[in-house]
Amino acid sequence: SGLPNGARIEIEYSDETDGDGNLIDQRQRDTYIARGDGRERFCNKFNHHAFRYAEVRGLAQRPRREDFRALAIHTDYRPEATFTSSDSDLNAIHDMIAHTLRCLAYNGYMVDCPHLERAGYGGDGNSSTEILQTLCGAAPLYRNWVQAWDDAMRPGGSLPHVAPNAGAGGGGPYWCGFIVMAPWQTWLNYGDRTLVDRHYPAMREWMGYVERYMKDGLLTRWPDTPYRDWFLGDWLAPHGVDTGNEASVSLVNNCFVSDCYARMAQMARLTGHDDEAAAFEARREALNRTIHARFYDPATQTYATGSQLDMTYPMLVGATPDSLRAGVEQRLFR
């Protein structure tokens, strides 16, 4: 109250401050022009902000705490699981994960972060699907999001790294392959085969696109496009995004393709495409043999760079022969 007509009030939001307590600029701002009728009230109906701190500029006097109210928004999914233990650290980790999922799930899909890009990256989706679907009844979210991926597919099966696809986003095969993994996980976790039945043709088309970029039995880098950048492998390596080692990038991406072949074979059988199931399984077995032959060093019992992911992924997808598995595990643990 008490603001003259035309007074300009600015509110800046951030989830970080610098050493002096100043907000770090995250380009989250609202501007309000006062009516001057003594009944000023502002609620942004067209945007949201993710923040821990807010700074108000343009008021003639210090506002009261009760003058402000923050409203949390998120997808209306149902909590389906709880976790408690005698370990306060584990309880805190669980609670932080649950809160993070609430912050990332809105607009009917998951985003990478709620304050900067706000984009539905497939890599973030693949890495969070199992935990979100374990904690929550979120099948409607995945029905909406997988449809966005299907809608974003280009002629010939090419996919972006982000859906809905408003522009280019960085990633790799693990991002595009959300269209395979999300329907599979939704059926596995919820017993809901709607996405498998509806999007199996799109999954099959994307696998065909992948195969057009295979050379000597391995997936190679596909081109950047106006809607897709990069060809990442392990983007969560301990020392940063591991894009510098081509062997690691190739190993990780081909292991993911192997995993996609396995899921496609299972979903092909589920949908009555038995001949296609056998073909996908044969391609998986051939790819696994090539992965092992190309990236395994028998002298050191390591794959590619010997990083944790390079060592574990071939075992997870079945590329490591049973006779060598114990040695690879021992080398990993050392």
Located regions from the model:
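Extracellular/oxidizing-compartment recognition motifs
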Residues: 1-114, 123-124, 140-143, 160-164, ...
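Phosphate-binding glycine-rich loops and their immediate beta-loop-alpha structural context
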Residues: 117
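Active-site core of glycosidic bond-cleaving carbohydrate-active enzymes
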Residues: 120-334
